[in-house]
Amino acid sequence: MEKALSKTWSERFDKGLNPFIEKFNASIEFDICLLEEDLDGSIAHARMLGIQGIITKEEALRLENGLQQIRKEASDGLFHPVISDEDVHFAVEKKLIDLIGPVGKKLHTGRSRNDQVGTDLRLWLRKRIDEIDMDLVRLQKSLFLLAEENLYTLIPGYTHLQRAQPLSLAHHLLAYIEMAQRDRNRLKDVRKRVNISPLGAAALAGTSISISRKITSSELHFQGIYSNSLDAVSDRDFVVEFLGASSLIMAHLSRLSEEVILWASEEFAFIQLTDRCATGSSLMPQKKNPDVPELVRGKSGRVFGHLQAMLTMIKGLPLAYNKDFQEDKEAIFDSVKTVKNSLIAISILFEEGLIFRKERLNQAVSSDFSNATDVADYLVAKDIPFREAYQLVGRIVKTSLEEGILLKDIPLERWKTFHKFFEKDIYEKLLPSSVVESRLSAGGTGFERVQEQLLSWREKLFN
């Protein structure tokens, strides 16, 4: 069994770790993702130690140069931590001492891995939030360009997955742009709480060494510092919040994916999948499968699961730091990867992976009773109480269904038997384009309202 002295913390121990426990305990295989942030945090800490006179300026410079050398070696593929290094923090410290000698042992003055890892994770997540925001913008732009082309293209609108009222296709696509904007706003809000520095809180109680937390906070471009050291090292609210925001992103993508899957089916046939974003069957040569939206729909469960896992993990933890926190990294790393890849895949799908079948869409909005509400509105405009008009139109629809005809095919003489107020202009009101055009309330699908929204979104997204 290896000797305890091979570990940074092992002076307290007589025997080394069981090899299985050593591997079980180590996080280096995944927290190596934090290397850049660990180096950034350590450089800021070294500079602060020099400024405060805790170490000499020459020592601070040697520490910084050594850390930059590690960065270069990592970039060149020459930095290879092993399981016995335990985590990214010890791997860096060990390498630093190898490079610059005993002065490397001064780097950890006035800090603990507890505040160090919290700093690293916040720095890493801050970057990823900014990247995801740009991925959301790409999705918004992809949807917008399709919406702009399809202001006057109509698509059936549904409630309970039953035909309800016709919509401008642009209006439908803009709904998802609105969802993405809420996702962006949530991430922006989460970022505020990510962007607080725990560095200098040490293990849990602060330190007796005359460090300056404000200097390191400023060096790392944090907005401020935690005011309570216990809270600083034990807070993972920002992880839960990020996973919550990510879960909503995936929920929105899953809803959009479900619609694409339905639209691509023979039963709907609203879109045609291009070869760029579809695959075939190993058995059935006629198939073209919507793999991209199906995968995104399936991947949403991964992110939901990580959120639940984090909530379960933190709910029973006493203050302050606990080894349980090691589990936050794989959850957040995988969630970031899943969200980013899903956003990019769906953006590509709408950029080059589908074509709306306009003839089929026109057929769909022209062959149902989704204009029935407009018959009621027609009567309301003639001073018939809405509920009375609603009940009358319900009887008209029932009769039409029994006779196998659409409202547009009812002769005018028959209309007049239902109510004397029906005139020839009822046929114009029944046109799908007229139905959509009439929805001029704020936020409605009327062409005028949708055009206003398109102009507004073009200004937001492209200027």
From Swiss-Prot:
SUPFAM superfamilies assigned to the protein according to its UniProt record, in alphabetical order: L-aspartase-like (SSF48557)
Keyword Transcription regulation: no
EC number(s) from the headed UniProt entry: 4.3.2.1
PROSITE patterns: FUMARATE_LYASES
Entry keywords, A to Z: Amino-acid biosynthesis, Arginine biosynthesis, Cytoplasm, Lyase
Source superkingdom: Bacteria
One BP annotation, GO: arginine biosynthetic process via ornithine
Pfam family, one: Lyase_1
Keyword Cell inner membrane: no
Family: Belongs to the lyase 1 family. Argininosuccinate lyase subfamily.
HAMAP family per the UniProt record, alphabetical: Arg_succ_lyase
UniProt protein name: Argininosuccinate lyase
Source organism: Prochlorococcus marinus (strain NATL2A)
Gene that this sequence comes from: argH
